[in-house]
């Protein structure tokens, strides 16, 4: 049936979308948040539409697990989305079904014990750090001011969903007139999530992660049209796919020493199957796109990740800096990998930056994020420096280092892909 086809392709399109594929291979809490947010929303939808209290209890239980994974957002976000959807449905019964006492009870039984234990063990620091800094401050003050733009997520979503972006927008337009309850639910889930995080001051690429689920489900509704040979959905499936391949091929030029020939073979195969055999393989287009996408991403990771890793990891730098005799400092930002790889706890140096750079500096409340030893520029100048002093500056901070008043007192010791080690001249 059509529903079975849509269900299967929903999973395939989600698994092969660019951002989902990347984040799902990373060790971050967003994956666990999605794992429990999806059943929260889908079970709530079934429970509300069918007046099924068991599904509502499952939704509240899942929301409790989501709160244990990444804090109050596990309840606040799905709760807000469901309230908006109920409002659009204009059905008072849905609002009444949304708050069963059994579900609320199971939520507190699931989430409250951990929060109570953390407060009993840590007291006010738990409230101040976890709930205050990592929730309230994150929402009201940007951790990365340069990324705080209203269009951030709406621009990011089309790239995150590649190669299924075209089918996503195709289905949005196709189903717009009918506006079924499930269509409205998916639209609220997707764009409500983007709007929610747009209103938050701190912007992260990973925040669009949850929005990929409804986007993939919408895109999957176009699968029957593509496999039946319809021209427009067929083109909207292939063009974004070719753009993704082109982007991956362009990325190979940044790492010329890697072995990219498998990616070239995969690309040639996809061009032959999808372009030269366009009319003969209409029923296999989605299968070819998903298979080639997985192959291309696997090749990219295996060939490119070892080279790319050194631009994001301080493994080589850490070993070199650790072996240098003397005092070790980090300019403005602290590389956690240094302590991980060496066992040494270095000191973070907080410089006094020129006024024109102040707009890019975080709110002072973010200083509580740094648990490692820190020293101000004034304190650094007062220290007795009887042994050599080395300062590591990440690539992103090199421009600030050049504007720093003490810049001329340092000389380059060693350059790396991800930054530079400087030595203080006596």
Residue ranges and their predicted role:
Residues 57, 171-426:
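Membrane-embedded architecture of ER/inner-membrane glycosylation machinery
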